[in-house]
Amino acid sequence: MMTVYGFQQVQLLNLAYAFQHIQDKNIDKQLISTNNFIKEDIFLHTTISTLTDKSLDIEKNMFTNKDSFELNKYSIEEFTVPSGSHPHDVAPAPDGTIWYTAQGSGELGHLDPSTGVTRHIQLGNGSAPHGVIVGPDDAPWITDGGLNAIVRVDPITNETRIFSLPEDIAYANLNTATFDQSGILWFTGQSGMYGRLDPANGNIKIFSSPKGPGPYGITTTPDGEVYFASLAGSYIARIDLESGNVTILEPPTPEQGARRVWSDSFNRIWVSEWNSGKLGVYNPDNKSWNEWQIPGENPLPYAVYVDEHDMVWISDFASNSLLRFDPILEKFGEFKLPTKDAKVRQLLGIHGEVWGAESNTDKLVRIQMSN
């Protein structure tokens, strides 16, 4: 791969986007230096000049062939979890182990990838956990549709703390959660609501979602905004963290079925469009949308996740694969899942790894960058 001044091509391409991002916002280029993009403006101009050189066009064409994204540098591995678990979501812990919701057995699961050993923690009678994330306290937090509650599990003692929804919310069909930068947990319920939980005092506030049922995926951006997607409503929404009110943002394709959302490092919101078979992105800087048709026959994009290199990962039920999308080259790369009809419903990662839950096979899957 081409290297310039110690930067690999993907880094240069991302730097080019960063430079364009800054230009679009009319920020003085000197700010780039103070934000550690690079040390000197002259180096920026040299780098951008290199990016626009014809030699890069040649290299770019080479980079986007069948071996684009250097897919051969990645390995894919599955980990078996107890039968009947039907894992729905995964959440890597700081120590490299993996939490997962065992929706089929009403438990929280834990996998040590170095040994393959799993353990399960019971969450209570009627539990049907959907989402799990690791909070700022390093503990797993679960959205449990069966218990109609948010559940925190102590990662050391396995002690559970249940935050039940208000009694007037009979069944929220709890889905996914995210922490904002103030430590407030925001969550969605497909029955037609979203809410906030203050872990410090246990207070929960519920809001009715626009257009009724549908709230599904939710994400926090680097600048602290919180967005959720509505599958039935076919929109994404930005939440005002003070009032709880939302601004609806509709993708260009009608009835597209926005299912999950994730933010990249530029605060852009990536959307898996279940009904339309597209990958969408919303840019809050200029309030613009873009969409790409996912390759293959009748694609069904479910999960979406953006890694530390701003590469976008999608699970596709139709092709039984995970896809990696480069937003600068606008190219997809495909990783076929080893087990047929895996149904990966959620993706999350840590440095150099992307994890998914195979809800139909009682397995977790990892894509890992080789050294």
Locate predicted features.
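Short, compositionally biased, intrinsically disordered N-terminal export/targeting signals
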Residues: 2-19, 44
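A short helix->beta-strand "capping" segment at the edge of beta-propeller domains
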Residues: 63-83
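A short beta-strand motif characteristic of beta-propeller blades
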Residues: 77-80, 117-122, 159-166, 203-208, ...
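Beta-rich, blade/repeat-based domains predominating
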Residues: 83-94, 125-136, 168-182, 211-223, ...
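Conserved beta-strand positions in repeat-built beta-propeller and related beta-rich domains
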Residues: 99-104, 142-146, 185-191, 228-232, ...
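A short loop-to-beta-strand structural motif that recurs across blades of beta-propeller domains
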Residues: 107-109, 149-151, 193-195, 235-237, ...
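Short loop/turn segments that connect beta-strands within beta-propeller blades
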Residues: 112-116, 154-158, 198-202, 240-244, ...
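Blade-level signature of beta-propeller repeat domains, shared across WD40, Kelch, NHL, RCC1
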Residues: 343-371
